[in-house]
Amino acid sequence: MYKVIARGGMLAALGLLVACGGGGGSGGSAPMPSPSPTPPPQKTLFVATQPVGAVQAAVFATQPVVNVRSNGVTDTTDNATVVTVALVAGTGTTGAQLTGTTTATASAGVATFTNLGISLAGTGYQLRFTATGITDATSSAFSISAPPPTGQVSFNIDSTQDVHAISRFIYGMNGWDPTVRPKNLTLSRSGGNRMTAYNWETNDSNAGNDFHNQNDNFLGGGTEPNGAVRPGLEAARAAGAGMIVTMPIIGYVSADHLGNGDVANTPNYISVRFKQSVARKGSAFSATPDTTDAFVYQDEYIHFLDAKYPGAFAAANNPLMIDLDNEPDLWQSTHARLRGDTNPATQAGTTATYAEMVQRTTDYASAAKDVNPAALILGPVNYGWQGMIRFQDASDANNRDFLDFYLAQMKSAETNAGHRLVDVLDVHWYPEARGTCVNPDPNDSDKTHCRITIEDTQAGTVAARKQAPRSLWDPTYTENSWIAQFSTNGPITLLPRLKGKITANYPGTRLSITEYNYGGANDISGALAQADVLGIFGREGLFAATLWRLASNNNFIYGGFDMFRNFDGANGSFGDTSIRATTSDVAKATVYASVDAANANRMVVVCINKDDAAQNATIAVTHSVQFHTAKVYQLTSASPQGQPQAQPDVAVAANSLQYAMPANSVTTLVLSP
């Protein structure tokens, strides 16, 4: 029995519950004790992002983030707790000091540190995080690397930053033959000036100003429809690669292959030597095209390909894609006979206009999409810079940027059609960068500077070639070219510039470069530039790219491809996912890194030493897996036929390694646990 004492709220203070019996009852229920009071929340600190070391006396590559937790859950109402960090005594190197701001105030329960570092190199460092009245937390152990020797470079790789898929179609080449070097490419293209007037029904084509403006059968293929394109197309697709075919949109294609010189020597040559190339047939397609009529139908070409290769336009890894002609901004000179110049002594046709290009693109792209909506359409296939900005001074340019106009018009065309017509913005890029030289080119008026695309290996040309890839992206680099001097008045930053136009005018459009070349085909400088370009294409998110060869011996350019696609001679390849990779000196050395989406235990790093002296590289890696070994493949000027050579493995400790890069070399490292 409980004795109840009624005194000034004593019952409540004692936490007792009293039950009284009701009227007529025999006694009452025994009083029950009240529930225990709710304990105050237990607050703890939790290291949400572990610190990742870098080089001594530098800020951490990854700064720590600490959560203030209440009963195991981040307290998002906490905007006041001050978290203090200190080195755990006895860890790391004796005498080391923690540098930077050692306090951080929580915001929504999260305290983020921004500039911490440690003064001395060492291993096993730990940090302790404390706050008044809150259970503290300790970080995982981490390492701090010694700085590289003076004048050397450091690379930092972080698989948690800038992570995105690499398009498989950036490793391409025009007219690729899978049976010879370079192996294991991913895209081929049937393009070039010859395709502008290519008759897919008969394989006749016109050389334009490349060779006397004559009609001939230079492309081969006999009388089989698409015979000139078929062997390369089928070889590429059998090798697992995609294929870009060209749909002519100039309005005429060759009607014969007489090979008798300039077609302008034939009276009424347009009607006699050419057939009208029409976007739409307007009637049922034929399994075999009619070669006796006056027309060649381009939608029937797409139907022919679709029937010959079912599902190819929608294939994931080896699709068919369609380029809308080739360099239409140069038709007036490359195919002057089809642009109104009937004089065999001149090459001065009429330049296509902005409006004409939009209309032709709309007509032919919509015709192709009506046959197969899955077909990827690439356009406008500009030849280069002046074509991109003014369409080679088209009569209706009116100081408007051509690509801005083109993209905006294609967006409107999509609205009208109810679906996309152009999927990929396609341009060509032959750099105009020049280096100091004694110019051997008799057709070049500049006798003291050489364009890097020629096969010159004088020191100034080589130096310019090695730096030229930076104009694809680097806002701090200005090349020596007429573009940088008179058009951009500074850095070109080609890829960010083009992506910015897409974002502003037609979001969702992809980007390709279906012809490019940096010269030095059989020189180590060509390999360095090619490898650099492939790394940039992957990092910057390009959709597709195909090299156009300018020389007969391309061994070192092929070597540049090998370092990404066949470094071990067994199709060893760069990963499918790009991650952050930074260099301390972009002029001397660049670095690109990848992981595999399906395999965290493999990381591939490509290191490019552009310096004429050997460079010792310190490589620090942030990754979820601890690596222990790096397989090494190397390309130098001494590499036979520009082929990579395997080197002894290098040990990796605490995800850090030192590697001595030979002068002017490309090194591919394959890291594994």
Language-model-detected regions and their locations in the chain:
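Structural preference for beta-strand elements that scaffold enzyme active sites
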Residues: 165, 170-172, 242-244, 319-323, ...
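Carbohydrate-binding surface patches
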Residues: 586-626, 667
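C-terminal motif of bacterial Sec signal peptides marking the signal peptidase cleavage site
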Residues: 18-19
